[in-house]
Amino acid sequence: DEIHFADGGVYRHAIGYGHFMETLLEAFPNEKDALSAYCSLLAKVGSLISPEVLRSGRFSAGGFDYMSMSAYDEIAKLTSDERLLNVLAGGLFQNAGHSRKTSLYEYAMVNHSNIEGAHSFVGDTQHVADAFVDVIKSNGGDVFTGSEVTALSVAGDRLETVTVNGKDEIIADNVISTIHPAATVSLLDNNSIIRKSYINRIKTLENSLGAFTAYLLLKPGVLRRSACNFYLYDTPSVWSAYDDSGNGEIHTMLMCHQNNGKSEYADVVALLIPMSYSHVSKWADTRTGRRGEEYEGFKAATAEKMLSFAGGFF
């Protein structure tokens, strides 16, 4: 990854802890101890999601301690260099992190995976979804598309049935929901398990930000594909770059060149900015392709702002 600041500063997050540290030492030669401690901390927390731990099917007990720690506070203990502190937060876009909100566990899991993993997929990510489906089916499972869970029926102290599309019922020993907690509890029928006070609290919690994405389709041979992702910031304070002002201003952006595996040139560039749901909530009850001229105008205007923002860095 490359972290770009409006003052011209460019810093790199390399793959592999050794390379990661060596690369940042070129920009911060006096921060060797801080970077060493940082890498050790990330690797320690990241070990909690090792394949061995995941195969056990249990959450590592040590992870709970890191969930109650502030990522910003713990990293700030390692260095007094403000620019380094913000460079280490360069990839916060992936979880819209913030100095007041992001836990060390959340931060470390994302950044450890980035350092130890690949920077992009060859082609699109559909083959990852296909691989998941293959694993599920090879273990006797089924995957249903075009299906919406419309009710979760409670009997006594357990969830008894899951209703799909308002008619089909599924009975299971365990049910896992990965949609918004407030949306999950709204599906409960005859709820006698979860207290009303908890449900009310879940519904009033501040939501995290989503991402607005603009895809640029390029003419062949125009732009050489870069082997990295670009994080662009017009503010020196990355840790607060994701405050939603509500005025539509852009302060940070993620830019990616899709690796099609066929050419050294990019055919698609993706531009992503963080966005609060409040900006699009007026179209909540509409369907794709039927949201009207106002929505199309909103998309076009936002895309133009994004192009202008990105153009200021290259």
Regions found by a protein language model. Give the residues of each.
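Rossmann-like flavin
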Residues: 6-102
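Glycine- and acidic
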Residues: 90, 112-120, 211, 284-295
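Residues forming anionic-ligand binding surfaces in small-molecule and nucleic-acid pockets
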Residues: 102-113, 274-276, 283-285
